[in-house]
Amino acid sequence: MQRLIEGLQKFREGYFSSHRDLFEQLSHGQHPRILFICCSDSRVDPNLITQSEVGDLFVIRNAGNIIPPYGAANGGEGAAMEYALVALEINQIIVCGHSHCGAMKGLLKLNSLQEKLPLVYDWLKHTEATRRLVLDNYSHLEGEDLIEVAVAENILTQLKNLQTYPAIHSRLHRGDLSLHGWIYRIEEGEVLAYDGVLHDFVAPQSRINALEPEDEYAPHPNSPLISYDAFKVPGKERPGREKATESPAPQLSPLPGFGHLPREQAERIYRGSR
């Protein structure tokens, strides 16, 4: 605590003093252009990894960067998203998971949490779709490899869950909003972004040259909205598989989870999206 109190003084005398104009501007209101949804993990700092300024990001943090499907929970996530979209007119949403995620480790052994961590157990049940998908389709993996897959699949699950919210679904239909999935790899200081055409997590820096300076916060035409199934494990190439050289038009699924969930489960979880 002493270190934090000393930090308060250093902040005021250092950073605040040299950025008075910024804080004067922020005192009159906020105008973030990005909604950043990430994990509560202390190793993840959105402003640090993006090198963004105070006021650039509107942040939602919770264990596992989870967004329950519309109507499934009465937590603050839905309210925060509604405020971001309606009041702040944000047009970009990033869901950012990270390597070595404790929430994903817990998700893979969910039943063992029920007695000792009942609130965590109840929370992680909101991403049962991720757990079932990983256990059913990646039985050949274990340890950190399995956790790595869970982190990636969970990001895609949350992108689908976002689409079950009417305000988001409507804006996506109009082309007024983009969704992005990121993985922050702590040990490498690297961020990978999901590419809906390649079905892979790739370095987002490869897209920078395609953006005009004035469009840096505009909805991105390659936003991963639909084709989430069959992604490649980050950093691992699948034998005999080549990356696409062209960008085919995305094919809409009847339901957000239709690509890799049983239809009955997809309807139960995502029926609010249509």
Swiss-Prot record:
Enzyme Commission number(s): 4.2.1.1
Key words of the record: Bacterial microcompartment, Carbon dioxide fixation, Carboxysome, Lyase, Metal-binding, Photosynthesis, Zinc
Protein name: Carbonic anhydrase
Cofactor(s), names only, from the UniProt record: Zn(2+)
Natural source organism: Synechocystis sp. (strain ATCC 27184 / PCC 6803 / Kazusa)
Intracellular or extracellular location(s): Carboxysome
Record remark: domains: Dimerization, activity and interactions with CcmM requires all but the last 60 amino acids of the protein. The C-terminal tail (about 55 residues) inhibits CA activity about 10-fold; it might attenuate activity before encapsulation in the carboxysome.
Major site of localization recorded for this protein: other
Molecular function per GO: carbonate dehydratase activity; identical protein binding; zinc ion binding
UniProt feature, compositional bias: Basic and acidic residues: 234-245, 261-274
Catalytic activity: hydrogencarbonate + H(+) = CO2 + H2O
Region (Disordered): 214-274
UniProt activity-regulation remark: Inhibited by ethoxyzolamide.
Cofactor annotation remark: Binds 1 zinc ion per monomer, a water molecule forms the fourth ligand.
Protein function: Reversible hydration of carbon dioxide. Essential to photosynthetic carbon dioxide fixation, supplies CO(2) to RuBisCO (ribulose bisphosphate carboxylase, rbcL-rbcS) in the carboxysome.
SUPFAM superfamilies for this protein: beta-carbonic anhydrase, cab
Family stated for the protein in its record: Belongs to the beta-class carbonic anhydrase family.
Binding site for Zn(2+): 39, 98, 101
SMART domains, per database record: Pro_CA (SM00947)
GO terms under biological process: carbon fixation; carbon utilization; photosynthesis
Complexes and interactors: A hexamer formed by a trimer of dimers. Interacts with the first 260 residues of CcmM; both the N-terminal 206 residues and the C-terminal tail contribute to CcmM binding. Interacts with full-length and the N-terminal 249 residues of CcmM. A probable CcmM-CcaA-CcmN complex as well as a CcaA-RuBisCO-CcmM complex can also be isolated.
Cellular component per GO, a single term: carboxysome
